[in-house]
Every structure is written in structure tokens, then in C-alpha cells.
Amino acid sequence: MARAAPLLAVLATVLTTAAAGGDAPPGKIAVIGAGIGGSAVAHFLQQHFGPRVQIVVYEKGTVGGRLATISVNKQNYESGAASFHSLSLHMQDFVKLLGLRQRREVVGRSAIFGGEHFVLEETDWYLLNLFRLWWYYGISFLRLQMWVEEVMEKFMRIYKYQAHGYAFSGVEELLYSLGEATFVNMTQRSVAESLLQVGVTQRFIDDVVSAVLRASYGQSASMPAFAGAMSLAGAQGNLWSVEGGNKLVCSGLLKLAKATVIHATVTSVTLHSTEGKALYQVAYESDKGNSSDFYDIVVIATPLHLDNSSNNNITFEGFTPPIEDIQGSFQPTVVSLVHGYLNSSYFGFPDPKLFPFANILTTDFPSFFCTLDNICPVNISASFRRKQPQEAAVWRVQSPKPLFRTELKTLFRSYYSVQTAEWQAHPLYGSRRTLPRFALHDQLFYLNALEWAASSVEVTAVAAKNVALLAYNRWYQDLDKIDQKDLIHKVKTEL
């Protein structure tokens, strides 16, 4: 009888979890990953299914994922995603919902460095900046702006669709609903090809567009046009951050959802079934040993790419047909926070007092770094001022590889400390020819599928809302809300 006790306990768990059906909400939901995607989807799932659903979030690292900070000289600085676009509507909603505040902006000028000299410099006068763009590049910047605005206007439809409860089972279906074949084709055509077609000059692409893409993705203008448009939109709008650190959004959403966070590495998801309902067993390893539990719904909110850079070894067992491998590579990005004195001579300013820039983007050369920013801490007091160029400041250097000592000495006259964070930040666009699906099985979902079309914090939040709606609509068999065509007219009719 003692031997039977564990079996009875497991059976009881299975039967309780499988009490789904009809109008009954799911008993337990697993979310794998506690970055912005996992945190947001936990919040949305609780919002849709109600407060009784039990949500368990597995995280092998730190809550926040690619939203993270590093402490330098007793101040915290963003080491992951640093800012959000003014049109990041989900992120704005999260900040308001959690009672957080946007960080006070400390203005600084930007420039684009071409290896030997600055190819474009921002001034304090808006009209002079426009004149310089026109003088150097003609109306290319206007054509770029029109192209980006057209893409963003269509992309913003997703918020209206989601407000009406519509969801999509695949990335291609989502993109088609927003921009039809044009959006889908933009995942296969390059930024450069698309911009040349609308009259943007090659020189403008080489000098300006490439610099923005290197800053956002660490990639070139040969990357797909859709991801490029999302990146270029971010360069044109007002940017903002969260006072106290962007990662506060993740911890706040998990707390709001009353989610249970288990610090463990998920090793497998196994399909079971009871009374015709899918049931998923999630196995994991933690400091306390190996264990597993059963769930009605599982959301994977961490990359599933398979390449040499991946340490994600989740296996899928019992599925027929087998779960398709998400093949593709990720772009490594190293963020170095350097507390020191900038070597302004390298940028053509022998006198550091005369160096006017706080943000430096780069073209394809030099290749050893992508951006260099004089950054502010996550907590900014009313009396805070940006360090003068001749003073020791905290600089954020973004590079494709860890910086060698010689490279650090190239950028800095001297420094007190260097702290780094290495990220598999974005997909290496072009390494995968097809777009993955959100729905891997009946109630098994892959939230990070959307980053293979474009990657940003807000795009991940959009994917989180889509997956929550998809799970909800599938659970209650509301199929009219999934993968609908011609949604723009349907939504107008509903209004």
C-alpha cells in the first residue's frame, strides 16, 4: 500500500489538472521563461482565464531575461534592452498598470562614426539637422520615413485585432492579417533591396540605415526588410525607459498574475492524454533535484533555436507527428559597461572638453564595436547631470564579441572597471527560411516564434498577447477568433 501512495498522488494530480472541458477553465498552466515574454503572457493568461487558474513560471536564470541591469560604482545601469519606442502600447500599459514611472530623459547628441571620421553629426538645432540630411542625402530620409510609417501604420492594426480577441496560430498568418503578402515577402527581401526600390540612395543606406541596424540588431542592411523596418521605426520615435530599471516590468507582472516562479531548467515536455484531452508533463532540474508536474497548457517563452550557441535542451516526447525543430542561429551581442575616460582623440577630438556626443553609432567600420553610449543610471534624481566628456563616465559599448584589452585602450584613455553581459540577443536573420508557428500542439505554444520576423521588447509583448488569446480561444473552441481573413473589415463591422 505504501508503494501505491506515490502512484495515487500522481493520478490525483493528473485528474485534477485534466478537469478541463466545457466551460471549466484550465487548472494549471506552465510558462517556461521569465523574461518579458513569459512575464507578459502570465499576466495575459490570468487576465483571460481568471484568478483561479494556477500559473507556474520556470526560469533557469534571473527574472527579466534580456531586461537586466549591472551595478557600476554603486549605481545600476541597463545591460539588456535599454529603451522602448513611444508606440510600444503594451509596455506603456504595463507601466501604468504596475504604478511604475517613465525615467526622466537626459538629452545627449548623437553621431555616426565611419572609422576615420564622423559621417553625420547631430546638432542642437532641429532645422539644421534636417538641412544636413537634405544636403548630404537629398530626400532619401523623407522616403525612408514614409516607408517606415507605412509599415508601422499597418503593424499597429494588431492592437485593434487583439482588443477584439483575435489570435493567430502562426507568424505568417499574423503578418498576412496586418499587411497581406507585402509583410510576408518583407521577411524574405533585404532592407537594402526594399529601400532602393522606393528611391533611397545607396549612400544613405550605407551611412545611416546600416548604422541604425548595427545599433539595434548588430546586423547589416542585408537583413530582412520587416525586422529592419521595426528597427528603423525605433530610431525615429521618442524613446523611453522605466525608472528603477526596465526589468521591474517583468517582476511586477509576475506578482500581479500571482504566478509561482520555480528557478529550474526545463528538460522535457511529454504529451499525455486523459479523456481525449491533451495533458503535458513538464520535467525540470533544480538545486533540489529532478522533478516534474502536469499542465493543461504550456507556453514556451524562451528561444528554441538549435545551433552551436544554444544551451536550450528541451526535448519533446510522445508527440505524433514530432514537434518540428526550430532551426536557426542567433546573433551574439556583448554589452560592456566601462567606467572610465573616453579617448576622444580616436574620434578626431584631441581636446576631450570639445567632444560633444553622448551616443555614437558606427557604419560597417570599425568592426570591433557597434555603438558607444554615455549612459545614465536607472534611477535619475532631479539634480542628475550627464558627465562632461573630460570626466570619468559610464559608457555602454555594444560589440559582436568581447572586447580585447587593445580595443578597450583604443576607445578609452584609462578606465576603472569593465563589466560585461553576453546575450544571444536576436535571431541571425537569414539563417532560417520559413517562419515558425505559435501553436506547436493543441495547448502547447511557442511565444518566441514572432522574433523570427522582428525582435524587440514590444514585439515580444505582442506575441505574448497573441499566445494568451490563442490559448483562450482554443480552450473554449472559439475558432471564429483564430486565423481569420480580412480582419480589418471584420473589426470595422464589429465596431
Curated annotation (Swiss-Prot):
One of its GO terms (molecular function) is prenylcysteine oxidase activity. Glycans are attached at N185, N343. GO terms for biological process: neutrophil-mediated killing of bacterium; prenylcysteine catabolic process. SUPFAM superfamilies: FAD/NAD(P)-binding domain. Its cofactor is FAD. It holds the Pfam family NAD_binding_8. Residues 1-22 form the signal peptide. Disruption phenotype: Increased susceptibility to ocular infection by the Gram-negative bacterium Pseudomonas aeruginosa with increased corneal opacity, hemorrhaging and higher corneal bacterial burden despite increased neutrophil infiltration. Keywords: FAD, Flavoprotein, Glycoprotein, Oxidoreductase, Secreted, Signal. It is found in: Secreted. It comes from the Eukaryota. GO terms for cellular component: extracellular region. Likely to have oxidoreductase activity. Required in the mevalonate pathway to regulate prenylation and enhances the bactericidal activity of neutrophils. Belongs to the prenylcysteine oxidase family. PANTHER family: FARNESYLCYSTEINE LYASE, PRENYLCYSTEINE OXIDASE-LIKE. This is Prenylcysteine oxidase 1-like. The gene is Pcyox1l.
